[in-house]
């Protein structure tokens, strides 16, 4: 039994290959150091950064988390001018870990968590990268934006006391 997402993603990388025949490796030995480094940045400043921003209880904490979040997104935008993915030109675990936050960003984090400096669609390279990941075989079939929005907007009554789930925004998917 495990509910730690960083460990679960590693298990799914190879633990069931003998059953599925899938040989995809999103954590290749030669790239592990780079993947681990980018995972640290992405987790602390983006994946968890949206929560630090959204659940901040002081103006200072909000502004600090907000600034770090968008500085890191700006860095990712620059990185993606040089490569198609976070670690070179192959999709790795680092990309899938970032995907989960990016796919929710414009619909949830931008308004609900007040991460409202820029939308992901305002970052041309990140937006193209997100579309590319979304179109990987089997991925779009797992994204249910109505479920995502309902979860966030209806469950965080401290942030959204009415529980109203917004109709928008219009997204590419």
PLM features: residue spans?
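C-terminal alpha-helical interaction module
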Residues: 1-173
């Amino acid at each position: 039994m495990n509910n730690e997402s960083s460990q679960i993603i590693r298990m799914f990388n190879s633990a069931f290959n003998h059953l599925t025949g899938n040989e995809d490796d999103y954590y290749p030995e030669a790239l592990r150091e780079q993947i681990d480094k980018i995972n640290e940045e992405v987790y602390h400043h983006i994946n968890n950064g949206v929560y630090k921003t959204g659940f901040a209880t002081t103006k200072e904490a909000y502004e600090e988390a907000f600034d770090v979040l968008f500085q890191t997104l700006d860095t990712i935008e620059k990185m993606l001018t040089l490569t198609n993915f976070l670690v070179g030109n192959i999709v790795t675990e680092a990309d899938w870990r970032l995907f989960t936050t990016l796919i929710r960003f414009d619909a949830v984090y931008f308004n609900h968590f007040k991460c409202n400096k820029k939308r992901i669609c305002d970052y041309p390279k990140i937006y193209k990268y997100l579309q590319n990941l979304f179109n990987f075989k089997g991925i779009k079939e797992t994204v249910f934006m109505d479920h995502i929005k309902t979860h966030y907007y209806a469950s965080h009554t401290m942030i959204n006391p009415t529980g109203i789930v917004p109709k928008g925004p219009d997204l590419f998917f």
